[in-house]
Amino acid sequence: MVKIDKILLSIFQRTFKSITDEMSISLTKTTRSPILCEAKDFVTGLYDAKGNMLEQTENLPILSFSLGPVCRVILDQYGDDISPGDVIIHNDVFSMGNQNNDVAIFKPIFHEDTLIGWAAAKGHQADIGGAVQGGYNPNATEVWQEAIRIPAVKLYEE
């Protein structure tokens, strides 16, 4: 059986919590969207190299646990083609996204040449295209009529 150092575990947990809180504060202070800065319809988090959640803010509980599975989609899609400078965008409901208006950004974290984790943020966007304003279209017959679908795509590649 592995012995867990409770003090070290607590230090890491509080450090990760502090980081995700700072991510949340930065997003709130820099966004121009009232959906994000006033309604707090977003989440920030840290994940290990396999996409398992280490820490995540509690801004909107329905978004909890929504980013880890997308990390695994990114790993399946890109494999070893992930570099320290990459930035990946995603909102696709057919690859673990929860709705097209919730757009996520992922940044891999490396130590030397080894992927050790992910920093990610997901937030609700008022309108990202579609047949009607706001993305809610009760007459839609396909997802493309609601909003643009963005599978895991490198927004920036090192």
Question: Language-model segments: which ranges?
Answer:
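Mobile "lid/hinge" segments at catalytic clefts and subdomain interfaces of large enzymes
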Residues: 112-158
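Acidic, glycine-rich active-site loops and adjacent beta-strand->loop/helix elements
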Residues: 60, 92-96, 122-127
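Conserved mixed alpha/beta core segments that line enzyme active sites in large multi-domain catalysts
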Residues: 25-33, 52-54, 68-108
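Alpha-helix capping and helix-loop boundary segments enriched in small/acidic/polar residues
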Residues: 7, 58-65, 96-104, 134-141
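Long, charge-dense accessory insertions within large macromolecular proteins
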Residues: 2-63, 68
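Core beta-strand residues in small-molecule sensory/regulatory alpha/beta domains
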Residues: 47, 106-110, 122
